[in-house]
Each structure stands twice: as structure tokens, then as C-alpha cells.
Amino acid sequence: MDLTYTDEEEAFRAGLRDWLSLVLPELPAKPSPQDWPGRRAYDTAWQRLLYDAGYGEVHWDASPTQRLIFLEETEKAGAPYVGANFVGLLHAGPTIASEGTPEQRDRWLPPVLRGDEVWCQGFSEPDAGSDLASLRTRAWRDGDHYVVSGSKIWTSHAEVADWCELLVRTAPVSEAVPKHRGITWLAMPMDAPGITVRPLRTLAGSTEFAEMFLDDVRVPVANRVGEENDGWRVTMVTLSYERGTAFVGEVVACRRVLGELAREARGNGRWGDPALRRRLGRLSAEFSALWRLTQWNVSEAQRTGGVPGVGGSVFKLRYSHARQELYDAAAEVLGAGSLDLAHEWTLDRLSSLSYTIAAGTSQIQQNIVAERILGLPKGR
């Protein structure tokens, strides 16, 4: 494993830094977390800037190391994250790039890269979260369309999305068809008749998630990514990107927050508490280790062809808990100020509670690590 950067990679870093120094001072103020239409406009405008500068495809066509450099430098510079483009850039886009037909790639990828279209994720259901393969949303063929009925929950960005990466059951579960089979991956247009979206307000006041109800929604068969009943395999590609790369920029952000916490503690007198200093030191070591793990995962992805491997589950497991510990420490540093919902760290602390659940619970990640890395049996 080689964790050093080549001259070409360092040149990429230098060029990116120069570009960021020019464009970031000109950006408008970021909308509030509660203003999702405003956030969509802001996030897609940022993506268009990246596209025009030649950085729009960095999540797909660049090498894994260049993606890592991009996420590191944009976060250090305080640039916007992917925001409303999250599903399109980090879930659906890489999946379509890997599994889609040439026609599908030509249709869906350029609008995502330009910031013209936003995607949401329709995976989880009220009775199919961690056990995603238990999903019940049904799709049946009617000529050159699928007719879809069912419901989804925790649908990211549904309120502002143009498209949905949707998992449906196209064959009922039976002795001949286990639940992991009979699933199909569809690209559903969000303006199709029969779709009802109800926003879900989080503890932090955001409505980035929603319930979605589907009543005989017609989706063209041409919008199927992969083969019918082979959607679980396609979904594993999606989830490998979600767990392998989607949180990389956040590690850089957490390391920055650690420095800010130390400065805040020195300023408000809490730095004199040795227990707090030990806590922050332990977190610093944890996030340094997570960054090295990220570099290792990226090195492995580059060696094996670009798709993140199961090492992403190790990262997701450790990062979820470390993030919660970080913002618990932030509450200790802020004291009574941690009750102020206008403070960024307070909102981050509330949102961190979901990290051991979202994108696969910690228990699911432990199972993946046990079975696919340690080779332990599946017996319970």
C-alpha cells in the first residue's frame, strides 16, 4: 500500500486550491437547513460551477486518489458539500455509470454533472430498513412499463428531486425466489402521476427526508438499471459507494471541528479540565486513524478497479460512533450554549444521532465485517 501522492496528484491539488481561492469569496450566503428549495438552487449552482471548471466528474471519472484530494481540499477551504446533489453524485450516478446501458448513461449522467437534475433515494420502507431485502413495494409489467405501488420512507431529497433511484419487488418471495432475488432497480421520474411526497421534519428542523406513496405509478421498462430481478446485486454497488466514499469529506470536517473545539475551550476556560483535554486528544487520534483508513480504502479501490470494497463498512462503523462522540464533546465545550438550535454544532449533534442508523445500521456493518472480512459463520 502506497499512501504517498504522485507529482500529477499534487499538481491536481495545487490547481484545485488555486481555483477555490478564486471562486469561494464570490459565493452567496448559504440558505438555512429548513429552506430545501433554496438549498437545491444553491447546491445545483455550485455543481454547475464545478462542471464548468472541469471538476464536475471528479466523483466518477477521476481516480480514487483524486476524489480523495478533491474532498479534502474543498472541505478544508470551506466549499459547499454536495448537498441536494448527494444521491445523484454519490449513489445513483456511480451506479448508472457502472451498471447502466450506454443510452442510460447518456441520458442521466450529464444532467447530474451539470447540476440540472436532482435525485432522491427510494430504498427504505416502513417494514424494510436494516432488512432492506424485505421490501414490499410491488412492480408488475404492463407492456413497456412497470406499474408500481407501495410506499417508501426516509426518502432523501424527495421534496426537490427530479428522479428517484427506486427498489421494487418484481417477483414475490417463495421457496424458489428468496427475498434477495426478485428485486429490481428503477429510475422513476418524480413528476409521474400517482406519487405523493410528505416531508418528515427531523430533530434539527430539516425536511431532507420524506415519506413517499406510490399508487399505480408507471415507469418505463427502459428505466430499469440492470436485469429484472437482479436489483439486489445492483443495490450492492450503490451501497458500496455510499459506505465507501460518501462520508470522506465529513472526516475532514470533523478534524476541522476538533481544532475549533480546542480554540473554543481555551477561550471559555474549559481547557483547564484535564478530562476534556484527554477526550479531545482521544478524538484527534480516532479521526487521524479514520483518515488513514480512508486512504487505505482509496488505495485498495484504485488497485482493484475503482469500486469501494467492504473496507467501507469498517470505516462507516467507526466513523458513525466517532462523530457522535465528537459532538457530545462539543456540547461539553459549549455548556449551556449547546441548547441554542441556531448553533451549527447543536444541529450537527442532533443529526449525528442518525449516523449509527442511516446508510446501514452499525449492527449491519458489524455483520458485514464479521462475515466478509473475518470469515465468521452466519449462524446466530
Residue ranges and their predicted role:
Residues 115-123, 166-167:
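A short, Trp-centered hydrophobic/proline-enriched beta-strand micro-motif
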Residues 137-139:
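A structural signal for short hydrophobic beta-strand segments in well-ordered beta-sheet cores
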Residues 28-37, 266, 270-277, 288-344:
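C-terminal helix-coil-helix/basic helical segment that borders enzyme active sites and/or dimer interfaces
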Residues 1-86, 107, 111, 260, ...:
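Amphipathic, small/basic residue-rich leader segments at the start of a protein or domain
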Residues 144-145, 149-198:
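A short core secondary-structure module
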Residues 47-110, 114-115, 157-163, 287, ...:
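Internal helix-loop-helix
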Residues 3-5, 195-290, 355:
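Glycine-rich beta->alpha junctions and the first turn(s) of the following alpha-helix
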Residues 69-70, 91, 232-247, 334-380:
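Glycine-rich phosphate/cofactor-binding loops in nucleotide/flavin-utilizing enzymes
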